[in-house]
Amino acid sequence: MITIRIDSLIELMDRVAPPELALPGDRIGYHGPEIEVEAVLVLMDYLEDVAVDGYDLLVLHHPPEVEPPIPYLTVHSNWDVADGGACDALADALGLDVESFLDPDTGVDRICRADLSLEELLERTGVLNPETLRVVNPREYVDRVAVVSGFGLSDKSLIMRAWSEGVSAYLSGDLTHGPAILGRNMDLTLIDAGHHATEMPGLHRLREVIEDFGVMAELLDTGTPWSEYRAAYI
C-alpha cells in the first residue's frame, strides 16, 4: 500500500465518479487541508461514535449531518450514476444484466434483464442482507427489473418512468405510502429492500476502487440508523 497526496487521490476518484455526474445541489467533494493519505475509512454515514483514530481520510457516501473530526471526501450521486458505480454494483450483486436507463438524463438508475420468477428475484436479495422486504403487487414472473441504489422508491417520477418503460418490477429502497399507492394503481411490482441494503454493494465496490489505487481502505458498515420494534411492544 502507498501514501498519496490528497489532490492526487481526488484526481483518481474524479475519474471513476466524475463530479459533473452529481445531481443538482448534492454536497459532494473534499473538505479538509492538503494532506498525505495512507489509510482511508469508507462509510455510508458518519456517526459521532465511529472511531476514526488511525485513518487519514473518511470517504463518505452520504454528506455528513455533523462535521467529522478528520478530513473527508463525499462521493454520493456521482457514484450512484457512474459507470461501474453504485447502481451497477447493485445490479451485479443481484445477478442482473443492465440493458438501459429509466432516466437517461441523470443515469441514476438501471433497467435490467431478468427472466425470473418473483420468488427467485426475492431470494437473490438475500445477498443484500435486507432487514425486511416489502412488496407491492406481487406477480409470478418478472422479465425486466429497474434498480436504483438507495432512495429510488421515494421518487414518484421514477415509478412513473418504470411503468412507462414497461418494466415488471422496480427494486430499491425508501418506499413510502404515496409511492406505494401509485405503484399499486399502476399494477407495477415494487420491491423495497431498504436504503441501506441496496447501497451496500456500491460501498464495497468503492472500497475496492480505492484499494486498486494502492491505498489501504477499510469499510465500516454502521447499519441502519434505527431499531425496529414489533407490534407486541406497542
UniProtKB/Swiss-Prot annotation:
Residues that coordinate or bind a divalent metal cation 1: H61, D80, E199
Binding site for a divalent metal cation 2: H62, H195, E199
Gene Ontology CC: one annotated term: cytoplasm
A GO term for molecular function: metal ion binding
Any Pfam family matching the protein: DUF34_NIF3
Highest taxon listed in the record's lineage: Archaea
Key word Metal-binding present: yes
Keyword annotations from UniProtKB, A to Z: Metal-binding
PANTHER family cross-referenced by the UniProt entry: GTP CYCLOHYDROLASE 1 TYPE 2 HOMOLOG, NGG1 INTERACTING FACTOR 3
NCBIfam families: YbgI_SA1388
Family from the record: Belongs to the GTP cyclohydrolase I type 2/NIF3 family.
Subunit structure as annotated in this protein's UniProt entry: Homohexamer.
Name of protein: GTP cyclohydrolase 1 type 2 homolog
Species per Swiss-Prot/TrEMBL record: Methanothermobacter thermautotrophicus (strain ATCC 29096 / DSM 1053 / JCM 10044 / NBRC 100330 / Delta H) (Methanobacterium thermoautotrophicum)
